[in-house]
Amino acid sequence: MLPKKKLHMKVGILDSTLREGEQTPGVVFTTDQRVEIAKALSDIGVQMIEAGHPAVSPDIYEGIRRIIKLKREGVIKSEIVAHSRAVKRDIEVGAEIEADRIAIFYGISDTHLKAKHHTTRDEALRSIAETVSYAKSHGVKVRFTAEDATRADYQYLLEVIKTVRDAGADRVSIADTVGVLYPSRTRELFKDLTSRFPDIEFDIHAHNDLGMAVANVLAAAEGGATIIHTTLNGLGERVGIAPLQVVAAALKYHFGIEVVDLKKLSEVASLVEKYSGIALPPNFPITGDYAFVHKAGVHVAGVLNDPKTYEFLPPETFGRSRDYVIDKYTGKHAVKDRFDRLGVKLTDSEIDQVLAKIKSNPNVRFYRDVDLLELAESVTGRILKPRPPENIMALISVKCDSNVYTTSVTRRIVLIEGVREVMEISGDYDILVKVEAKDSTELNQIIESIRAVKGVKSTLTSLILKKM
């Protein structure tokens, strides 16, 4: 095994789900959702939260204001960053809202200077210096983002960094705005910048246009970057930026450091998936449904003997669990293990017969536990009773009386022990309740408690068979 690498600097995360992430086409967060996401990011230990651009719209302003209020009350621990153009009014809004830091961005490549800013290099330097100084005069910390830095003239980039340092910025974000960096170049870039400007700390903001965002932020950290920009689920303009869950896992594996609470990554990723409306593909690293699911018979046999054969870290590291698929690729080890889990004892001959039936139906995508039991019963001629499930999770659909205010029912259901999440929904039912129970007896008690709530007309319970 290759030895773990060591970073020379301490590295932290700036998560930009609320700013960069909301720039994903079709994504809009409500004010309440912004606050909930910010609290979740703080809870997992994100060092900085880029809460948005307060001058863009009243709802973003209000969301950032509420997030900052929670910071002042000690509920949120992360540093709160407000995004800003190099415009005095934007800076005034960021200062007025009392953000911990104002992040001023300005495109510094010749393409940006000409096509977007309609200015010259010298005029841009004067404008940048003026706005950074103006922000600093308001008593806030200042980060300057060199937008499109990786396509800018390098000597001009150095001039820009010197200018913003002299004007009072203590951090500079190097933005690979169109995702054209590659890792070895990234490492060299940050090594050079950190050696030239030891009094400045550098961020890396890497877009994923060529699929190298995660590799580039790791290389930047090796080169001396102290803050890595991420979004949950890799949201952002076009194809997004480095995903928080993948960056955190890579830092753990390659450098042995935990920048956030890894066990809570799936939970916050699901929260953003729900609020953004952007579903993760099942094969997404770390938090995708298939991230720790094995299929090929040789793979499953190896994992059953020693999970390290096909897992770089245990899924429990990330609050996940491993599983495997039963289909035509399955071997005897997997079939035997699945029946052992169900508490059903079969002879070797019976397992071989079940496996033969599985392989004789090559177009079946996967076999559920109930399907396997039916196959086993057809082989053995016996009625098989699986072990009663433990640690049951279920979804309970609730229909309310027509003359009842649904929210009043929801508020009572939330208070029932064992209820984990309550959602008001459209369709034949009014409320969806996610519950967790240690056994079937406790589940029945929860169901009866829900049915006893005034205004509940009927319920329908569905057991959660598998959680990826």
Curated annotation (Swiss-Prot):
<keyword id="KW-0028">Amino-acid biosynthesis</keyword>
<feature type="binding site">
    <location>
        <position position="177"/>
    </location>
    <ligand>
        <name>2-oxoglutarate</name>
    </ligand>
</feature>
<keyword id="KW-0479">Metal-binding</keyword>
<feature type="binding site">
    <location>
        <position position="205"/>
    </location>
    <ligand>
        <name>Mg(2+)</name>
    </ligand>
</feature>
<dbReference type="InterPro" id="IPR002034">
    <property type="entry name" value="AIPM/Hcit_synth_CS"/>
</dbReference>
<dbReference type="GO" id="GO:0004410">
    <property type="term" value="F:homocitrate synthase activity"/>
</dbReference>
<feature type="binding site">
    <location>
        <position position="20"/>
    </location>
    <ligand>
        <name>Mg(2+)</name>
    </ligand>
</feature>
<keyword id="KW-0012">Acyltransferase</keyword>
<keyword id="KW-0460">Magnesium</keyword>
<dbReference type="InterPro" id="IPR013785">
    <property type="entry name" value="Aldolase_TIM"/>
</dbReference>
<dbReference type="InterPro" id="IPR054691">
    <property type="entry name" value="LeuA/HCS_post-cat"/>
</dbReference>
<comment type="pathway">
    <text>Amino-acid biosynthesis; L-lysine biosynthesis via AAA pathway; L-alpha-aminoadipate from 2-oxoglutarate: step 1/5.</text>
</comment>
<dbReference type="InterPro" id="IPR000891">
    <property type="entry name" value="PYR_CT"/>
</dbReference>
<dbReference type="GO" id="GO:0009098">
    <property type="term" value="P:L-leucine biosynthetic process"/>
</dbReference>
<feature type="active site" description="Proton acceptor">
    <location>
        <position position="299"/>
    </location>
</feature>
<dbReference type="Pfam" id="PF22617">
    <property type="entry name" value="HCS_D2"/>
</dbReference>
<keyword id="KW-0457">Lysine biosynthesis</keyword>
<comment type="function">
    <text>Catalyzes the aldol-type condensation of 2-oxoglutarate with acetyl-CoA to yield homocitrate. Carries out the first step of the alpha-aminoadipate (AAA) lysine biosynthesis pathway. Does not display 2-isopropylmalate synthase and citramalate synthase activities since it cannot use 2-oxoisovalerate or pyruvate as substrate.</text>
</comment>
<dbReference type="InterPro" id="IPR011872">
    <property type="entry name" value="Homocitrate_synth"/>
</dbReference>
<dbReference type="Pfam" id="PF00682">
    <property type="entry name" value="HMGL-like"/>
</dbReference>
<keyword id="KW-0021">Allosteric enzyme</keyword>
<dbReference type="InterPro" id="IPR050073">
    <property type="entry name" value="2-IPM_HCS-like"/>
</dbReference>
<feature type="binding site">
    <location>
        <position position="83"/>
    </location>
    <ligand>
        <name>2-oxoglutarate</name>
    </ligand>
</feature>
<dbReference type="InterPro" id="IPR019887">
    <property type="entry name" value="Tscrpt_reg_AsnC/Lrp_C"/>
</dbReference>
<keyword id="KW-0464">Manganese</keyword>
<feature type="binding site">
    <location>
        <position position="207"/>
    </location>
    <ligand>
        <name>Mg(2+)</name>
    </ligand>
</feature>
<dbReference type="GO" id="GO:0046872">
    <property type="term" value="F:metal ion binding"/>
</dbReference>
<protein>
    <recommendedName>
        <fullName>Homocitrate synthase</fullName>
        <ecNumber>2.3.3.14</ecNumber>
    </recommendedName>
</protein>
<feature type="binding site">
    <location>
        <position position="143"/>
    </location>
    <ligand>
        <name>2-oxoglutarate</name>
    </ligand>
</feature>
<dbReference type="GO" id="GO:0003852">
    <property type="term" value="F:2-isopropylmalate synthase activity"/>
</dbReference>
<keyword id="KW-0808">Transferase</keyword>
<dbReference type="Pfam" id="PF01037">
    <property type="entry name" value="AsnC_trans_reg"/>
</dbReference>
<comment type="similarity">
    <text>Belongs to the alpha-IPM synthase/homocitrate synthase family. Homocitrate synthase LYS20/LYS21 subfamily.</text>
</comment>
<feature type="binding site">
    <location>
        <position position="19"/>
    </location>
    <ligand>
        <name>2-oxoglutarate</name>
    </ligand>
</feature>
<dbReference type="GO" id="GO:0019878">
    <property type="term" value="P:lysine biosynthetic process via aminoadipic acid"/>
</dbReference>
<dbReference type="InterPro" id="IPR011008">
    <property type="entry name" value="Dimeric_a/b-barrel"/>
</dbReference>
<feature type="domain" description="Pyruvate carboxyltransferase">
    <location>
        <begin position="11"/>
        <end position="266"/>
    </location>
</feature>
